[in-house]
UniProtKB/Swiss-Prot annotation:
Chain positions covered by the region annotation Membrane association: 171-172
Annotated spans, SOCS box-like: 151-180
Modified residues (Phosphoserine): S144, S165
Free-text comment on this protein's domains from its UniProt entry: The BC-like-box motif mediates the interaction with elongin BC complex. The HCCH motif (H-x(5)-C-x(18)-C-x(5)-H) mediates the interaction with CUL5.
One GO BP annotation of this record: viral life cycle
One MF term in the entry's GO annotations: RNA binding
UniProt membrane topology term: Peripheral membrane protein
InterPro entries: Vif
Name assigned to this protein: Virion infectivity factor
Originating organism: Human immunodeficiency virus type 1 group M subtype B (isolate RF/HAT3) (HIV-1)
Keyword Phosphoprotein part of the UniProt annotation: yes
Length: 192
């Protein structure tokens, strides 16, 4: 029998970002209780030796599974130390991989109060509307002018610690263009 390969998309992430994300997930599962129904699976509960943890997020009757890996092959950069994250959407026997933006939208849709475009219609129907969005990572586009005007009237409430964002977990913070200060800024940058 020949070997069969299965290819998965794994986002390379540095381990400190993974540790921060895990602690945010645990905080909102056990302390703030905003992540109701979420399930955290430790590395010792998995049979796969490379799985560091799994977070199961059930939006509706399906599941979003965020798996963190360790011991992967290192990448071409120094900080690619063999840590990674995969994001999978499962419903019964069907599963597919999703990108971090879609994962955040699914989490946002099912779990957190939001003052969104539908809030313009809801008060006229007699529904109660939340005056803010608790999970800003779930929005990836600019809203309508009505929405922006209503959002400008409400002051956003800062949540400490922030809610766990899958996009923030997988973003590449190392390859962004470096911002340097002007003439009066950092003296080490301009050689003085």
């Amino acid at each position: 029998m020949e070997n069969r390969w299965q290819v998965m998309i794994v986002w390379q992430v540095d381990r400190m970002r993974i540790r921060t994300w895990k602690s945010l997930v645990k905080h909102h599962m056990y302390i703030s209780r905003k992540a109701k129904g979420w399930f955290y699976r430790h590395h010792y509960e998995s049979t796969h030796p490379r799985i560091s943890s799994e977070v199961h997020i059930p939006p509706g009757d399906e599941r979003l599974v965020i798996t963190t890996y360790w011991g992967l092959h290192t990448g071409e950069r120094d900080w690619h130390l063999g840590q990674g994250v995969s994001i999978e959407w499962r419903k019964r026997r069907y599963s597919t991989q999703v990108d971090p933006d879609l994962a955040d939208q699914l989490i946002h849709l099912y779990y957190f109060d939001c003052f969104s475009e539908s809030a313009i219609r809801k008060p006229s129907l007699g529904h109660i509307v939340s005056p803010r969005c608790e999970y800003q990572a779930g929005h990836n586009k600019v809203g309508s002018l009505q929405y922006l005007a209503l959002a400008a009237l409400t002051t956003p409430k800062k949540i400490k610690p922030p809610l766990p964002s899958v996009k923030k977990l997988t973003e590449d913070r190392w390859n962004k263009p470096q911002k340097t200060k002007g003439h009066r800024g950092s003296h080490t940058m301009n050689g003085h």
